[in-house]
Amino acid sequence: MAAAAVVEFQRAQSLLSTDREASIDILHSIVKRDIQENDEEAVQVKEQSILELGSLLAKTGQAAELGGLLKYVRPFLNSISKAKAARLVRSLLDLFLDMEAATGQEVELCLECIEWAKSEKRTFLRQALEARLVSLYFDTKRYQEALHLGSQLLRELKKMDDKALLVEVQLLESKTYHALSNLPKARAALTSARTTANAIYCPPKLQATLDMQSGIIHAAEEKDWKTAYSYFYEAFEGYDSIDSPKAITSLKYMLLCKIMLNTPEDVQALVSGKLALRYAGRQTEALKCVAQASKNRSLADFEKALTDYRAELRDDPIISTHLAKLYDNLLEQNLIRVIEPFSRVQIEHISSLIKLSKADVERKLSQMILDKKFHGILDQGEGVLIIFDEPPVDKTYEAALETIQNMSKVVDSLYSKAKKLT
């Protein structure tokens, strides 16, 4: 019985590159076959077949079948060790969730697995699955639920020895706080995660996630784009080494750093590099267009890139936030360049030069006047901008402060001399 299963499994593996459907059918037949619990070889072959079948279903985009497989194998899990059962469930669930197929059953399936782990009294597996559920809540923007479950899980994990899972949950907490714009707490959670990670060996995926979050926090809080770039590069190498789909995201963030550092010319060199070449596509093209617009200081090209690559740029909250700031800076630079030769200019004329609506130009000019980017007033009655010369800096206060400082030194000197005489 076991020998026949081994032969079938080997045949299924040999068909992986030529006929995936046939390979899936063979693996299905092995998985559905009843086996004797005391037949170790048959149990091992069935376990390998389940993992191989799960991987194939994920690669071929069969999310519903993969979800069904996860439920179907539960009775078999009682015939293998708890550690192997936990690995099998986690692997299948990770494959299902990493597909990002948006079936709408992700949370439900995860909760079912958690309930099964609770009923079987498998604490470690339950904690691992709850960590995955926190991640799922984060991905579906259910931030309060993510924080609530995450804080419960953290209290449990700090009493136990699973440091890798603790790092994972601390990272998720940091991501959630960042999504809620609570940067101090996001940074504190990240610091905790890095401290815990320093004491253990981090698998490549976890290390890459840690580097990615470090880059995001450095970019968001400190605007330290050079440090952020080095973190994103480390994350990219980590994800690339395990063929993770998140590698392209870290590459996008690397390109974003180059744009924000005012070195858009480096973007082309990065994209055509050996490591990044395999990720060429719409994601990288979007950032290349933004880099070109930034280099040419062209608002029209910038807006065209945002329209043409809406999904790649606007739907990513990290890129969208920073590109909004870049657009704002670019608009200010363009406006200052346009109004520089004038002392009085029609707003209509400015809007025609930079190809933006009159209302948008008026709103931005008002903001710039309030921020003291230049001195002037808007005459809305006549629809003109009146620009004043920059007033000379009044140095009276500086001179007064300098005089007081010098007098203070004289008084101190006289006091020390008088003290010596007494």
Swiss-Prot record:
Record-listed cross-link Glycyl lysine isopeptide (Lys-Gly) (interchain with G-Cter in SUMO2), residues: 274
Cited InterPro entries: 26S_Proteasome/COP9_Components, PCI_dom, Rpn6_C_helix, Rpn6_N, TPR-like_helical_dom_sf, WH_DNA-bd_sf
GO cellular component: proteasome accessory complex; proteasome regulatory particle
PCI domain residues: 224-392
UniProt xrefs under Pfam families: PCI, RPN6_C_helix, RPN6_N
Modified residues (N-acetylalanine): 2
Top-level taxon of the source organism: Eukaryota
Record family assignment: Belongs to the proteasome subunit S9 family.
Subunit details: Component of the 19S proteasome regulatory particle complex. The 26S proteasome consists of a 20S core particle (CP) and two 19S regulatory subunits (RP). The regulatory particle is made of a lid composed of 9 subunits including PSMD11, a base containing 6 ATPases and few additional components.
Biological function: Component of the 26S proteasome, a multiprotein complex involved in the ATP-dependent degradation of ubiquitinated proteins. This complex plays a key role in the maintenance of protein homeostasis by removing misfolded or damaged proteins, which could impair cellular functions, and by removing proteins whose functions are no longer required. Therefore, the proteasome participates in numerous cellular processes, including cell cycle progression, apoptosis, or DNA damage repair. In the complex, PSMD11 is required for proteasome assembly.
Protein name in the entry: 26S proteasome non-ATPase regulatory subunit 11
Organism field: Mus musculus
